[in-house]
A protein has these predicted regions:
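Alpha/beta-hydrolase active-site loop
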Residues: 40, 70-89
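Short beta-strand element of the alpha/beta-hydrolase
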Residues: 25-33
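Primarily recognizes the serine-hydrolase "nucleophile elbow" in alpha/beta-hydrolase
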Residues: 84-137
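Conserved alpha/beta-hydrolase
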Residues: 48-67
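The serine-hydrolase catalytic nucleophile loop
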Residues: 34-46, 153-155
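Post-His helix in hydrolase/transferase enzymes
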Residues: 179-195
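Short beta-strand/loop motif that positions the catalytic acidic residue
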Residues: 136, 142-144
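N-terminal cap/lid segment of alpha/beta-hydrolase-fold proteins
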Residues: 1-21
Length: 214
């Protein structure tokens, strides 16, 4: 897949830069954790594209080629801008893939527009980032390195408090976040992500789903 420049203008005027790989009408958009950049998601790009999805990844403000300074308070603003841009580009399925503190922010029901599904790598709760699962039934898939007790407890708690489907895939390692896309876990993680997104696409196209939205 050939990468194209992808830009998002946030509500406070900050320009976020990234890359997109256009494909089918359904989109998977990806946001890294603090201290990273969009390169962490490259292992997913080819497999998702081969499955017929359009893919986009951004650098958060203050990271990579994006403008601004990194700040926890800016995470919801950046995520909302990314989702709004994706919704302008498609009326199809919209899936968010995120890691760490950004993954936790994606759980807020106040984040609009809402995605159809969430793939969350080691969500990390942090002061100033709201996570309120009781108001949101978005289907979710969590990844976590279970050898880190705090990370494992966080994911189990989030899964238990979730409304709607919430699956957890854990690995016997302290590795967390998008680093789980490295060996030896890479192929299994990729398979699970693509399978989950395929399932979300099938559910979004079902007559029950279509009838329930009218």
């Amino acid at each position: 897949m050939r990468a194209l420049p992808f830009e998002v203008l946030t509500g406070d005027g900050t320009r976020l830069r990234g890359e997109s790989w256009p494909g089918g009408p359904d989109w998977v958009v990806m946001a890294h954790d603090f201290g990273g950049d969009l390169d962490c998601w490259r292992p997913l790009v080819g497999p998702l594209g081969a499955a017929g999805y359009s893919v986009a990844a951004i650098d958060l403000r203050g990271h990579g080629a994006s403008e601004g300074e990194p700040a926890t308070a800016s995470i919801p603003v950046d995520l909302a801008a990314l989702l709004a841009q994706a919704r302008r580009d498609t009326s199809g399925l919209l899936v968010v893939v995120a890691a760490g503190t950004v993954a936790a922010a994606a759980l807020s029901p106040d984040l609009l527009p809402r995605p159809d599904a969430l793939v969350l790598f080691s969500p990390r709760l942090q002061e100033g980032v709201e996570t309120n699962l009781r108001g949101d039934g978005t289907t979710k898939l969590f990844f976590v390195g279970a050898a880190d007790p705090e990370a494992d407890r966080t994911v189990v708690d989030l899964r238990n408090r979730s409304i709607g489907h919430a699956g957890v895939i854990s690995f016997p390692t302290a590795t967390q976040g998008a680093d789980l896309l490295q060996e030896p876990w890479r192929s299994h993680v990729i398979e699970q992500v693509v399978g989950f997104v395929d399932h979300a696409r099938a559910m979004s196209a079902s007559p029950t789903r279509e009838g329930g939205t009218g």
